[in-house]
Amino acid sequence: MRPLDVTPTISPGAQDLPRTMHFAAEPPLQPLIIDITEEEKLEITYIGKKLKRKYKSYDDPGFISMLHLNAYTLLPERIAKVLSNFGTDFSDQQYGAVVLRGLIEIGQDELGPTPRSWQETDHEKIMEYGFISSLLHGAVPSKPVEYFAQRKGGGLMHAIIPDENMSFTQTGSGSRTDLFVHTEDAFLHNAADFLSFLFLRNEERVPSTLYSIRSHGRPDAILQELFKPIYKCPKDANYASEEALGDDIRTSVLYGSRSAPFMRFDAAEQIYNEDANQDPEALHNLKRFWEEARKLIYNDFVPESGDLIFVNNHLCAHGRNAFLAGFREENGQLVKCERRLMLRMMSKTSLINIREVTHPENPYLIMEEHYGKVYSAHLANL
């Protein structure tokens, strides 16, 4: 990993980033980290509780239909401006991730013990955090969505919890192996535009890993090869092996601007999964790319309770280090602790552009299965 000197931050009270400011020529190597003030934290915490009392659930149609207005009306102005700028900045200096450090006060006693798996989540206990996450996406502006390919929808927000039965998998439920960096749902044409990861607990002190395509600078000859539509990507480890392979479709890893491209990439599935059966040229190109990319992975940020990472899924891949769930190290000794608990939300900037792959009765439920192939609508119990 390239040595880092100073973590970029916006100090408390600073306003939005001016569009005309001049950036250094060096490519960005780490996310912007914004320290939330105590006043902002109290305001956001209050907003979450207030919206829960009014709407009961963050997927209430009345709340979702007013999401963007609520975001600009209710969020602290500084945070709304940062996210609004973030949503339209695809420049060569945009890393593609923003950390909102100390965003919200998490009531640990009210939260109770971490469930054994996401299936046992008590959604009532995390409801107010769903409202807050939704508002942040609304400020981009972007609309929260759910994917049938993940938990058969499962709602607009997913609890990410280490599951002992899946501890060695390349999924959010894993823990005992490094989760390789990946853009979310790289096997879909209509993957999320933006992601948020709200950490309710990270007592094991697990670093989050981020990797931005912008960290390479202007694409060299190795990266230019990734514009070729020759790369396969199976579905992830949530699927049985035969089902995961899907159709034999090839796409590019990089797309969009040749000088400042977007990325669709999953290291685990495209490089380390032998069942992907990449063509020799494709695998050669991916391995050369990975040798460069892995040196640019940023994992110096250890989230604490109440921190949130906001990600542009077209620019920045995410993952995490391996850890032993329910234990942290203190003075060389393993000490028992509550297991990690994180909340993920995904969003799209346009429901119109994805309408052919969304459920006929629910434009927020994306039914894409694998690179344009769509699940039958009758599978979803609405």
Swiss-Prot record:
Its cofactor is Fe(2+). Its EC number is 1.14.11.-. One of its GO terms (molecular function) is 2-oxoglutarate-dependent dioxygenase activity. Fe cation binds at residues 182, 184, 318. Being totally regio- and stereoselective, this enzyme is of interest for biocatalytic purposes to produce chiral scaffolds that are of synthetic value in the preparation of more complex functionalized chiral molecules such as natural products and analogs. It comes from the Bacteria. This is L-lysine 4-hydroxylase. It comes from Chitinophaga pinensis (strain ATCC 43595 / DSM 2588 / LMG 13176 / NBRC 15968 / NCIMB 11800 / UQM 2034).
